Design a protein with these regions (language model features):
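Short beta-strand edge/turn micro-motifs at domain boundaries
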Residues: 132-158, 171-212
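Primarily extracytoplasmic ectodomains and periplasmic/lumenal surface modules that are beta-strand-rich
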Residues: 57-61, 118-120, 193-195, 203
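A mature extracytoplasmic/lumenal domain signature
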Residues: 66-68, 100-102, 113-119, 198-202
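Core segments of small alpha/beta cavity-forming domains
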Residues: 32-103, 122
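Short, cysteine-centered beta-strand-loop-beta hairpins and adjacent loop/turn segments enriched
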Residues: 116-134
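Gram-positive cell-envelope targeting signals
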Residues: 1-65, 109-113
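Short Pro/Gly-enriched beta-strand edge/turn motifs at strand-loop
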Residues: 80-84, 162-170
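A short, structured loop/turn motif at beta-sheet edges
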Residues: 100-110, 187-193
Length: 212
């Protein structure tokens, strides 16, 4: 069997970190200064709902809960099994703690949220070691080259997908490395309710804290 480079597998594995979720650019403005007198429990509840929706992965619903209804993209396609496995493992890992009180600002309030979650970059780094090993193992299990290569002697997409699926399962079976980040969320009054502003900091969280 002709010896093949591992670069296609390594690039595919490394590329997972860039595909955590495609977040559209959020454009938001300001609104008039709200009254300082407010029920902070309402602010905490609005933030809790946003965090819960974010963890569910339903970004279409989440968009409607954010100020300006930003386009949050389509997220990870479920058909891309390896990416989907990593993304939903990340979502399942998310936990958070809200600060007890918010801080008034000219346009609303801010509230600190401490997030603990799986480190996606640690998983994709592990894949760069695991994937070549799984490729060699799976290649040895095949009885025909046609199960690995196409007519142009390139890896078959289904073989690459099988390698990444198996490698991802192995990577996710390991005890996860966790991140802890504290975000300062901004909330403003709109349409009679408190809404979280889609700041860059929030977008970073919604994309899995990748590329830090």
């Amino acid at each position: 069997m002709k010896k093949k480079t591992l670069s296609v597998i390594l690039w595919a594995a490394a590329g997972l970190i860039l595909a955590a979720a495609t977040i559209g650019t959020a454009i938001y403005g300001t609104c008039s200064t709200p009254s300082i007198r407010m029920d902070q429990s309402v602010v905490l509840d609005a933030t809790e709902q946003v965090m819960t929706c974010a963890r569910s992965g339903d970004y279409a619903a989440l968009s409607g809960m954010l100020y300006g209804n930003p386009d949050l993209g389509q997220g990870i396609e479920k058909e891309d099994e390896a990416k989907s496995m990593i993304w939903y493992a990340y979502l399942d890992s998310i936990q958070w703690t809200l600060a007890e009180a918010c801080t008034p600002t000219d346009t609303g309030v801010t509230l600190e949220v401490t997030v603990q979650c799986m480190d996606i970059s640690a998983v994709t780094t592990a894949l760069q070691t695991i994937a070549p090993e799984r490729m060699n193992q799976l290649a040895k299990e095949k009885t025909k080259e046609e199960e690995i290569y196409d007519k142009d002697n390139n890896y078959l997409p289904e073989f690459v997908a099988e390698v990444l699926r198996s490698a991802t399962q192995e990577a996710l079976a390991q005890p996860p490395q966790m991140l802890e980040r504290t975000m300062t969320l901004e909330l403003t009054r709109a349409a009679g309710s408190w809404q979280v502003v889609p700041t860059e900091e929030l977008m970073h969280f919604l994309s899995g804290f990748v590329a830090e």
